[in-house]
Design a protein with these regions (language model features):
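Hydrophobic alpha-helical segments and their helix-loop junctions in multi-pass secondary transporters
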Residues: 100, 104, 163-190, 208-209, ...
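Select transmembrane alpha-helical segments in multipass membrane proteins
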Residues: 11-20, 46, 84-97, 128-134, ...
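Membrane-interface loop-to-helix entry segments
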Residues: 145-173, 351-362, 381-391
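Hydrophobic, membrane-embedded alpha-helices of multi-pass small-molecule transporters
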Residues: 16-26, 172-179, 188-255, 291-300, ...
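Membrane-water interface regions at transmembrane-helix termini and the short interhelical loops
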Residues: 67-77, 136-158, 224-227, 336-349, ...
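A generic transmembrane alpha-helix motif of multi-pass inner-membrane proteins
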Residues: 378-454
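Hydrophobic transmembrane alpha-helices that form the core helical bundles
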Residues: 36, 87-121, 300-317
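Extracellular/periplasmic helix-exit of transmembrane alpha-helices
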Residues: 246-275
């Protein structure tokens, strides 16, 4: 069958695709991480920005390309060459992470931290969070239950307003800086190895996971534009994606710089949400803070509706005991419960999960990108992923917070990891085993080709 002849996209169509990719990866909930990173890195903000950009900007684009090249319809299909059990487990973990465990409740708590918490006395902040998250997830449920597109339509208006407000904050921050970028203090842990620390901080955006889980929607839209011409899909995804991630990269870099400059006026905050509220209040007063609160609330609401709807759809397909609406109820209740732990606890508990998932996602993305070279040989996937999985499990255990941190089991695992896994001291214990897995699997693949087994 002859492949349909693809159309050449106009500049306007490229911009539309780029804006879709931008919307997929850039969310108000992610603003807090580059700001906090800037405060921690201080005058080393530039090298921190490089590391953050690799995992927060470049990797998400590569995840989209992986979806396009493998012609997958979701994270399950991308992971399938490793095996059915792995694919189902990986899809489940990513959807739980993006859904009720971390990303969805984080969107609610970021919105609360930026908009409501600064207005409440300390003794009312817990009850305030309870009331806010009740309302937040009730709205999420109603919109997702009725499958309304009201928020996506609203997003077309809100996102530009939000970006304009952010642009004005940047203008004010550099015209009237809070501190000197070249002299601000560096926190103790960011004196050395700042690029790697920025790289690991980029895990918090979860954008590479989002690309694997939801990237198919963008790729499908591109296919429709080029009459299903598969050869052009990856090329257009790369071009439009590059436009989008350059924009995201600039915003993240400026936020890191603003976070670093803020040290001239503010102490290091527990999270970037508090800092964002303080900075906007400093430059734009209560009106600016109120506008920011409304925009962040609506932006986070839009994101939460999208990811919990996707969670319910994926789970109803792979776990059909409950319908879409049943899984939606479970995800909203679960997100509400997690959100009431507070933003700091959500971030601290998400870290070990991300330290486990990200190495697997990175390796899966790399293998998917180069799969045409080895004809999708499953041995390449199985061997490499097996050797990545082991250190990823160690990373998960050794990044668990209290009460597990400090136990004898925790100490024994940590000591073993540091003693036997190279680069474990900088959080990259998976790198050497992964390279070893790649080398072994390449030898096996070449041997199979020579003996005509593939």
């Amino acid at each position: 069958m002859k492949e349909a002849k693809g159309k050449t996209l106009s500049k306007k169509q490229y911009l539309i695709v780029a804006s879709m990719i931008f919307a997929l990866f850039f969310g108000a909930g992610n603003l807090i991480f580059p700001l906090h990173l800037g405060q921690l890195a201080g005058r080393n903000w530039g090298s921190a920005a490089i590391g953050f950009s690799i995992t927060g900007v470049v990797l998400p684009l590569l995840s989209l390309l992986a979806v396009a090249i493998t012609r997958s319809n979701g994270v399950y299909q991308i992971a399938l060459p490793v095996g059915k059990i792995f694919a189902l487990s990986f899809m489940t973990l990513i959807q739980l992470t993006m859904g009720p465990l971390f990303a969805a409740p984080r969107n609610a708590t970021v919105s609360y931290t930026v908009g409501i918490a600064p207005l409440l006395p300390k003794q009312f902040k817990s009850i305030g969070l309870f009331v806010f998250t009740t309302i937040f997830f009730a709205i999420v449920f109603m919109i997702a239950y009725n499958e309304s597109d009201i928020l996506s339509s609203l997003g077309k208006i809100l996102n530009p307003i939000f970006l304009i407000l952010l642009f004005l904050v940047f203008v004010m921050a550099f015209a009237h800086p809070l501190g000197n970028l070249s002299t601000v203090a560096v926190s103790k842990e960011y004196l050395h190895g700042t690029v790697v620390k920025g790289f690991l901080e980029g895990y918090n955006t979860m954008d590479a996971l989002a690309g694997l889980a939801f990237g198919v929607t963008v790729v499908t839209a591109i296919k429709e534009l080029v009459n299903n011409n598969e050869k052009k899909v990856a090329k257009i995804t790369a071009k439009a994606g590059l436009m989008a991630v350059i924009g995201i990269g600039i915003i993240y870099t400026l936020l890191i710089a603003v976070g670093a400059m803020s040290l001239g006026h503010f102490k290091i905050t527990s999270d970037g949400g508090i800092l964002l509220s303080k900075i906007v209040n400093y430059y734009a007063g209560i009106f600016g803070q109120a506008l920011l609160a409304v925009l962040v609330f609506l932006a986070c609401l839009t994101t939460a509706v999208g990811i919990l709807s996707a969670f319910a759809l994926d789970f109803s397909a792979h776990y059909p005991k409950f319908s879409y609406k049943g899984w939606l109820i479970i995800s909203c209740v679960g997100s509400f419960a997690t959100a009431n732990l507070g933003l700091d606890k959500i971030i601290s508990w998400s870290l070990p999960v991300l330290m486990f998932l990200y190495p697997l996602a990175i390796v899966l993305i790399i293998l998917s990108l180069f799969s045409p070279l080895f004809k999708g040989d499953k041995v390449m996937y199985k061997v490499t992923m097996a050797l990545t999985l082991v250190p990823a499990i160690f990373d998960l255990i050794t990044h668990l917070p209290a009460p597990i941190a400090g136990t004898q089991f925790y100490k024994a695992v940590s000591q073993f990891r540091l003693q036997y896994l190279p680069l474990a001291n900088i959080g990259l214990s998976w790198v050497v085993p992964t390279i070893l897995g790649l080398v072994i699997s390449i030898f096996i693949h070449v041997w199979h080709r020579k003996t005509n087994k593939i």
